[in-house]
Amino acid sequence: MGAAPRLSAPRVLVLWAALGAAAHIGPAPDPEDWWSYKDNLQGNFVPGPPFWGLVNAAWSLCAVGKRQSPVDVDLKRVLYDPFLPPLRLSTGGEKLRGTLYNTGRHVSFLPAPRPVVNVSGGPLLYSHRLSELRLLFGARDGAGSEHQINHQGFSAEVQLIHFNQELYGNLSAATRGPNGLAILSLFVNVAGSSNPFLSRLLNRDTITRISYKNDAYFLQDLSLELLFPESFGFITYQGSLSTPPCSETVTWILIDRALNITSLQMHSLRLLSQNPPSQIFQSLSGNGRPLQPLAHRALRGNRDPRHPERRCRGPNYRLHVDDVPHGL
């Protein structure tokens, strides 16, 4: 996914012409939900990324923000921070359960209210509660992730979206405040083997239950810790939501060791439709925002970029799982 295009006068004129036409075609769209990754869906104009910041005043940061996401990570710019602690995952000793959902834009896993899953450590000063797992993927291998590393994309990107539960009562409030959100991203390649957690989400019996927009399927007995590599480093920076309203309140944590899924699992993802069954098929693939300028933001990592050949060893390069029941 390339860099975000700059808005020009012709683009603005096209937008207002499309808005005028839309006003005469049917009921007005919900302004909080009227966006897409593509400007044209089934012949109807729906604002794509270049227009997000123009169609809704609450989304203005999408157009004028200075700390937007996703970004291309230049490893030469990553500052080694030996004082970054390891990431910690708290599950309360319970298996994860929740609903796998085709939103029409993403494959989304929404965890049940219990158990509460928290992440802390790394660059985070507070404990953050898991709100959603989101899967983005491309129409072709190597071009499905939102973030890139040294100008290289990946076939998919898993984003674990958390809100700061120590400062805010819910995701909506955290989206509007400082230090509100933390998103852990894991990159995905297509290979001969598959990550065990993703295999549960992408096996044939599960993924075919969410073939169309608004389809949902309940899953249980999931071990979230199996999503993470056995050892890994991470890179962190301050950014934004990569969907409207593009709030600049996100601490991004990019895991530097990619996961794998099989070509069959990726093919199954590309067969998911962003429309209900009554409408023409349009693949859910290509569901990512273009790259945004990094500008002068700092990139920090817990691995020394001067010695990339060194393997991740020791407790700082493993996910620390706290499985003690909450409240004990």
Swiss-Prot record:
GO BP terms, alphabetized: one-carbon metabolic process
SUPFAM superfamilies per the UniProt record, alphabetical: Carbonic anhydrase
Family indicated by similarity: Belongs to the alpha-carbonic anhydrase family.
A single cellular component GO annotation: extracellular region
Glycosylation-annotated residues: N118
Principal place of residence: secreted
Name of this chain's protein: Carbonic anhydrase-related protein 11
Region (Disordered): 300-328
Organism: Ovis aries (Sheep)
PANTHER family membership: CARBONIC ANHYDRASE, CARBONIC ANHYDRASE-RELATED PROTEIN 11
Ranges of residues in domain Alpha-carbonic anhydrase: 33-303
Subcellular location: Secreted
